[in-house]
Curated annotation (Swiss-Prot):
Membrane topology label: Multi-pass membrane protein
Motif (Histidine box-2): 141-145
Motif position, Histidine box-1: 105-109
Gene Ontology process terms (BP): unsaturated fatty acid biosynthetic process
Record has Oxidoreductase as a keyword: yes
Catalytic activity: a (9Z,12Z)-octadecadienoyl-containing glycerolipid + 2 Fe(II)-[cytochrome b5] + O2 + 2 H(+) = a (9Z,11E,13E)-octadecatrienoyl-containing glycerolipid + 2 Fe(III)-[cytochrome b5] + 2 H2O; (9Z,12Z,15Z)-octadecatrienoyl-containing glycerolipid + 2 Fe(II)-[cytochrome b5] + O2 + 2 H(+) = a (9Z,11E,13E,15Z)-octadecatetraenoyl-containing glycerolipid + 2 Fe(III)-[cytochrome b5] + 2 H2O
Subcellular location: Membrane
Name of protein: Delta(12) acyl-lipid conjugase (11E,13E-forming)
EC number, as in UniProt: 1.14.19.33
One CC-aspect GO term: membrane
Superkingdom of the organism of origin: Eukaryota
UniProt note: domains: The histidine box domains may contain the active site and/or be involved in metal ion binding.
Length: 383
């Protein structure tokens, strides 16, 4: 028993040393955004309305197929088989929904087509059907891209300093505590972020994606926030009418649970895209846009990469060129990887294992060496 403590401490030191050696460089890179753009074939920046609509129709057909199977055949199964069939349906449909969300997200970046009005129309319909305020998130998400990895200004997952940690942060190092926090984040993280900016950028007053007067938005955007709210009211009304016709339990089984899984996937994927022990964060004295965009990690979700339209394994190039359509991102990533060198971070750790590991390791940020590299911070968990 007496050797457990020192052994664990030795492992921790070795882990931290290895992480330090594998870190993404924090110095200004030897290349510019223009250098990267010149290396990418011009066709990678071309948006095709036909191709984009193909992906929308493709996903809607798959969504409809699984809905039809679930609604018409699962209730006919023996009860024991229903207990297996419903969770399978929920998992599949939640993943398909995430793919549709990515297409709506692409509309918000004007990466869907050459026509802004088409992008906004399609994105508004897709996201409203998923109870997401399209324009509201479009504007806040754009600010995330403008301030990625900035401790003070990034819109999502702003890291805390050690002195600012909440009282419950210490339980992230405890398996039970970490499990409960992950469960809570996956279940409530996305709706609470939209509702009251939970785990979002700190503002001087209440912030919500549903409030047109929220400090998240400027005066030009407030009318579109109202339009987003109107879209959600209509979506909720449709769901209410469906519940009256089919029953509340039916609606929960067919739409509700996949919706919850969609919400969990949003949190899981976005957290892992920018949270890693080897990625730097910057305060305002050191931050610049390019280094912030490079503070991004591509991850491997296996066959789900394709279902998610490669938002998972091509996220860095998306941050560099937000109007690039997803079906060109893989090619562009491979082209710029040799130029990026050590500035490109890829982690093939299975995503659930990565979530568990990084949730425990990335608790707060601090500067490594006092007096050196001021403005550059790294994740730590030494509580």
């Amino acid at each position: 028993m007496g050797e457990v403590g020192p052994t664990n401490r030795t492992k921790t030191k070795l882990d931290k040393q290895q992480e330090s050696e594998n870190r993404v460089p924090h110095e200004p890179p030897p290349f510019t955004l223009s250098d990267l753009k010149k290396a990418i074939p011009p066709h990678c920046f071309e948006r095709s309305l036909v191709k984009s609509f193909y992906h929308v129709i493709h996903d809607i057909i798959i969504l409809s197929f699984f809905y039809y199977v679930a609604a018409n055949y699962i209730p006919m199964l023996p009860q024991n088989l229903r207990y297996v069939a419903w969770p399978i349906y929920w998992a599949i449909q939640g993943c398909v929904q995430l793919g549709i969300l990515v297409l709506g997200h692409e509309c918000g970046h004007h990466a869907f087509s050459d026509y802004q009005w088409v992008d906004d129309m399609v994105g508004f319909v897709l996201h409203s059907s998923q109870l997401i305020p399209y324009f509201s998130w479009k504007h806040s998400h754009r600010r995330h891209h403008s301030n990625t990895a900035s401790i003070e200004r990034d819109e999502v997952y702003p890291p805390a300093y050690k002195n600012d940690l909440p009282w419950f942060a210490k339980y992230l190092r405890n398996p039970v505590g970490r499990f409960l926090m992950i469960f809570g984040a996956l279940l409530f993280g996305w709706p609470s972020y939209l509702l009251f900016n939970a785990n979002g950028r700190l503002y001087d007053r209440f912030a919500s994606h549903y409030d047109p007067q929220s400090p998240i938005f400027n005066n030009r955007e407030r009318l579109q926030v109202i339009a987003s709210d109107v879209g959600l009211v209509f979506a909720y009304f449709v769901l209410y009418k469906i519940a009256l016709a089919k029953g509340f339990v039916w609606l929960i089984c067919v739409y509700g649970v996949p919706y919850v899984i969609l919400n969990g996937l949003i949190v899981l994927i976005t957290f892992l895209q920018h949270t890693h022990p080897n990625l730097p964060r910057y305060d305002l004295s050191e931050w610049d846009w390019l280094r912030g965009a490079l503070s991004t990690v591509d991850r491997d979700y296996g066959m789900l990469n394709k279902v998610f339209h490669n938002v998972t394994d091509t996220h860095l190039v998306h941050h560099l060129f937000t109007t690039m359509p997803h079906y060109r991102a893989k090619e562009a990533t491979e082209v710029i990887k040799p130029i990026l060198g050590d500035y490109y971070k890829f982690d093939d750790t299975p995503f659930l294992k990565a979530l568990w590991k990084d949730m425990g390791k990335c608790i707060y940020v601090e500067s490594d060496v006092p007096g050196k590299n001021k403005g550059v911070y790294w994740y730590n968990n030494d509580i």
